[in-house]
Amino acid sequence: MKTKSIFSFLLFFLITLSCKNSDNVLDNNEKDYPCNLNMENYDYSFGVQYDNSQLYLTPGTQSDLNDEYFEEIVIIIGTLPNTIPGILTVCDWFNHNFTFENAGGNMIGQKSVNELYESKTFYGCHSAALIISSILREFGFPTVMIETASVEWAYDYFDGVTQSFGGHVMTEVYVLEKWILLDNNGTFVEDYDCMNPFISTIDNQGLFTYAKGKDIWDYGVRDPSDTHNMMINFSDNVGCFDDKFNSVNYEWDN
């Protein structure tokens, strides 16, 4: 359990995370924060068609794993049952066969899944989620990558407390006729609401989803500045989402 916790910390991107220890992200909301968005028709699905899961068996450009590489993986781990333990088999294989290289967030959006597979290297949660979701898709699990920002970070960044960035990238997986949330370290939420952008974490650091797609190129992230701009936009409008914060309290399993 200790190893899994450390690994999860390593995947919390980008450079450093400046945050306060708070049991409730709303503790920061003692003043009025801005909202400059039209919330009347705000789309929390981010264009994902959840009622048509088969669409997410088709990879994006970045996540199109070579058949040869997938065949190598099948030789090692075999075929997988359409179950959560089957999904976790891929996470376990990834965690034991890829090496983490700390690039300080500079590799976000830079490599395709094939380039990452060839080097057996990942640079943080963006590349980890890309590898895992791409492989799961080849095994027949529809997958969607989600990009999130720390709610605590959004307040701190707006207040000028930090200039660094804090968030996380994970995967939504369709299995047994429902969408679950999968972290890169193999922990997961089975009772998951894919239309709620707020995500409660094990350590009470709430996350807020701001982008989704088949891979990060699919939702427009080609370099670190794309992620930074999306996060800054969330921070600049954090007051729009007060009613969503702490709206769910997930139980994480492994």
Where do the PLM segments sit?
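Bacterial Sec-dependent N-terminal signal peptides
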Residues: 17-35
